[in-house]
A protein has these predicted regions:
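Conserved class I S-adenosyl-L-methionine
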Residues: 1-36
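Class I SAM-dependent methyltransferase SAM/SAH-binding core
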Residues: 38-79
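A short acidic, Gly/Pro-enriched loop at the edge of an enzyme's catalytic core
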Residues: 78-89
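A short glycine-rich, Lys/Arg-flanked "PGG" loop and its adjoining helix->strand segment in the class I
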Residues: 105-117
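Conserved beta-strand signature within the Rossmann-like core of class I S-adenosyl-L-methionine
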Residues: 118-125
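SAM-dependent methyltransferase
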Residues: 125-194
Length: 232
């Protein structure tokens, strides 16, 4: 209920537009790193032969339910090497869990290692250090039968001198007249935009910015094209 599949339709359509623009029409091969439950990917599998990676077996089971034809691997996107090439690499929400520049660099190197020359890499950080003026609060209420869920997301940066931030989720669950409250705390990365572009360049990508919207909110995707010679 927190992140239903249909909530990804708008954004996934814009990822699909970029892939169509960048790739030669064919049954191209794509790899999603950190696929999670596979909601975003589920809107792309009709046009692409997809493979997906995640560290969590539970997430992979959820992904399998809505993406039954996708090849799945349990592994860390910073280190995995599948030994073959793809036409495009995608990293959606999972990129936020990279906590250091070394994490980012290793992940970008993974993307480059799995791409054909001229292949496409798409990712999109939620926040940049330069433009995050927290705390930020988002909330939403959803209902399903007798169950009502309200969740509140509180994002803040306790120490602007480091590369991490915290996101706290509070869930207010009402069912049959009873209220249950649960909390979940996530530690995520927060980097200057220039660091993203610099590290992608170091991994061998030329980078362009593509603005998309999700729920009416503008959001930047970084689209990298793999060069034959890595940039220093």
């Amino acid at each position: 209920m927190v992140t239903p599949r249909e909530g990804y339709a708008e954004e996934a359509a814009q990822w699909l537009t970029i892939l169509r623009e960048k790739l030669v029409p064919a049954k191209n091969k794509i790899l999603e790193l950190g696929v999670g439950a596979g909601h975003n990917l589920s809107y792309l599998t009709g046009e692409f032969a997809a493979t997906a990676v995640d560290t969590s077996p539970e997430m992979l089971q959820l992904c399998k339910k809505i993406n039954p034809g996708v090849e799945l691997h349990q592994d860390d996107m910073r280190d995995i090497r599948l030994g073959r090439k793809f036409d495009a690499i995608l990293i959606h929400d999972a990129i936020v869990y990279m906590l250091s520049e070394d994490d980012l660099m290793r992940t970008f190197a993974t993307a480059a290692a799995h791409l054909e020359d001229g292949g496409i890499f798409i990712t999109g950080p939620d926040y940049y250090l330069d433009t995050f003026f927290g705390p930020r609060v988002e909330y939403c209420t959803r209902s399903e039968g007798a169950l009502e869920l309200t969740y509140v997301e509180y994002a803040y940066d306790p120490d602007p001198s480091d590369t991490i931030m915290e996101i706290i989720f509070s869930f207010f669950i009402r069912e049959q007249g009873r209220l249950r409250i649960e909390h979940d705390r996530h530690i995520t990365g927060l980097f200057p935009r220039v660091s993203w572009v610099k590290l992608m360049g170091k991994a061998g990508f030329s980078v362009e910015s593509r603005m998309i919207t999700s729920g009416g909110v503008p959001h930047e995707l970084l689209v990298g094209t793999l060069s034959k010679t890595p940039r220093e």
